[in-house]
Curated annotation (Swiss-Prot):
Belongs to the aldolase LacD family. One of its GO terms (biological process) is 6-sulfoquinovose(1-) catabolic process. The gene is lacD. GO terms for molecular function: 6-deoxy-6-sulfofructose-1-phosphate aldolase activity; tagatose-6-phosphate kinase activity; tagatose-bisphosphate aldolase activity. Transmembrane segments: none annotated. This is Tagatose 1,6-diphosphate aldolase. InterPro entries: Aldolase_TIM (IPR013785), DeoC/FbaB/LacD_aldolase (IPR002915), LacD_aldolase (IPR050552), Tag_1.6-dipho_adolase (IPR005927). Pathway: Carbohydrate metabolism; D-tagatose 6-phosphate degradation; D-glyceraldehyde 3-phosphate and glycerone phosphate from D-tagatose 6-phosphate: step 2/2. The keyword Lyase applies. It catalyses: D-tagatofuranose 1,6-bisphosphate = D-glyceraldehyde 3-phosphate + dihydroxyacetone phosphate. PANTHER family: SULFOFRUCTOSEPHOSPHATE ALDOLASE. It comes from Staphylococcus aureus (strain MRSA252).
Length: 326
């Protein structure tokens, strides 16, 4: 991994003293609006969304090495973060066009890597939906798109964090048994691809390679993977890249995410941290809407703190320094 001194210094600002990225993800936009809409009849307002992000930043960033925010609703929160907390800013538009095939990527049109850097970002994050089994006419567009962003980040000398979410258009439910069977290959092959130097990715933000709800010992119903098979998928994931990689929480509970990290570590995965979002703060949404700012702050200081503190303890025992991979 040949990174510039500036990129290395920037990633250091995003990680803790042990070289582990213990980052808080709150760049949700569409998903957050849907969460909020469950608890109120009117459309969530810009002020509501911005204020909730500010609350989370004020209360939890002292316990995180960095925070991932979006430049659409998250800039007030970026100003409210702890002075020692690094900043990643998202570059992609939220969601994808459900009417078009391929889940093609799209940048926020009024932003660039240069502008995100000027806004104070220590890194640019971009989310890509990718299916290694999709038609090449779709995937070549995605590869070219990531090459552009990678080149932009090289030009601005700012780290590029690529988040890859896998899918299969033929399997609408990615929580299904059918998707669980194909997920390991899709996750690990995508990681392998985007580790190629041509993409100039510095850190991969990825899914765990299995659906833990179908792993023997974790499953309540059908088992798709034995513990040994699941462990092998984590080993294969680690071998699929030379780049630092961190796990996303994918909306699972705090407890399951922590158990997953322990399992990954025991399997031999030398992951370098997390970008954990909903598993840490999701419970604050309902409290904020139904009981107001003070109650949400109290939730963040108690349950939210416990979630992030427990996660940090697990990371201390399970994650390895990204510097071992460079």
């Amino acid at each position: 991994m040949s990174k510039s001194n500036q990129k290395i210094a920037s990633i250091e600002q995003l990680s803790n003293n042990e070289g582990i990225i213990s980052a808080l993800a709150f760049d949700q936009r569409g998903a957050l609006k849907r969460m909020m809409a469950k608890h109120q009849t009117e459309e969530p307002t810009v002020a509501q969304i911005e204020q909730l992000k500010v609350l989370v930043a004020e209360e939890l960033t002292q316990y995180a090495s960095s925070i991932l925010l979006d430049p659409e609703y998250g800039l007030p929160a970026s100003d409210a973060r702890n002075k020692d907390c690094g900043l990643l800013l998202a570059y992609e538009k939220t969601g994808y066009d459900v009417n078009a095939k391929g889940r093609l990527p799209d940048c926020l049109v009024e932003w660039s890597a240069k502008r995100l850097k000027e806004q104070g970002a220590n890194a640019v994050k971009f989310l890509l939906y990718y299916d290694v089994d999709d038609a090449e006419e779709i995937n070549i567009q995605k590869k070219a798109y990531i090459e552009r962003i990678g080149s932009e980040c090289v030009a601005e000398d700012i780290p590029f964090f690529l988040e890859v979410l896998t899918y299969d258009d033929n399997i609408p439910d990615n929580g299904s048994v059918e998707f669980a069977k194909v997920k390991p290959r899709k996750v690990n092959e995508a990681m392998k691809l985007f580790s190629e130097p041509r993409f100039n990715v510095d850190v991969l933000k990825v899914e765990v390679p299995v659906n833990m709800k179908y792993v023997e010992g974790f499953a309540e119903g059908e088992v798709v993977y034995t513990k040994e098979e699941a462990a092998q998928h984590f080993k294969d994931q680690d071998a699929s890249t030379h780049l630092p990689y961190i796990y996303l929480s994918a909306g699972v509970s705090a407890e399951l995410f922590q158990e997953t990290l322990k399992f990954a570590h025991e399997a031999g995965a030398k992951f370098n941290g997390v970008l954990c979002g909903r598993a840490t703060w999701s419970g604050a949404v309902q409290v904020y809407i139904e009981q107001g700012e003070d109650a949400a702050r109290e939730w963040l200081r108690t349950t939210g703190f416990k979630n992030i503190d427990d996660l940090n303890k697990v990371l201390k025992d399970t994650a390895t320094s990204w510097k071992q991979r460079k």
